[in-house]
Amino acid sequence: MIRHSTDRQFSLGAGCVRLDGPADSKIRLVCEGTLKRIDMRALADYFRNTADQFATGEFWGKLMRAACMLCAYTGDADLRRIVDDSAADMMGIQRPDGCLSTVPDALQPQGTHGSDLWERKYALMGLLSYYELSGSAAALDACVRLVRYTNTQVGDPPRTPITETGWAFCGIESSSILELSLIHI
């Protein structure tokens, strides 16, 4: 977890809580029945191929976050390998300038359907979750580079105001990237 000197509250770290009974059984069922069976590479392909399809990029980050949390909880070696491989794949997709998007350059930071920043937020969330699990300096660097890249496109003019991105509600869905972007500060 990234902590700042001004933080006063923190989440419990991995391994601080152990469950038993039905809750533990359900967690292990999710690991075996979903997280170990999902093709994470296929989900990363949306970033690799920049097909600009609405909200396709959110799923890698959501599943990566879940996999990292459950990997920390269970200590499952097979799930850890999946998580490590998927993080390496996603970091390999990221361009040197920090771009990690499902949208072609010419359509960023919006995309045809407005989900570009929403999808970047989930990629960032997945990579941050991996950093919290692994302590990988490369993962943290990938996060910082993605935030910096996004900051070149979104903000005060001549950049695009974040309230002019997204698909509804004056950019509220795009603005959800802002909290995660605090790593850049």
Features from the language model and the residues they span:
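Hydrophobic core segments within long, regular secondary-structure runs in both alpha-
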Residues: D20, D24-I27, M64, R80-M91, ...
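Well-ordered alpha-helical segments within folded domains of soluble proteins
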Residues: A55-A72, S115-E132, T165-E179
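N-terminal glycine-/serine-/threonine-rich beta1-alpha1-beta2 phosphate-ribose binding loop
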Residues: L63, D97-T102, G155-R159
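Low-complexity, Ser/Thr/Pro/Gly-enriched N-terminal "stalk/linker" regions
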Residues: M1-F59, A77-P104, A137
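Conserved small/polar residues in nucleotide/adenosyl-binding loops
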Residues: I183-I185
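Asp-box/WD-like beta-propeller blade repeats and closely related beta-sheet repeat scaffolds
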Residues: A106-L117, L140-T165
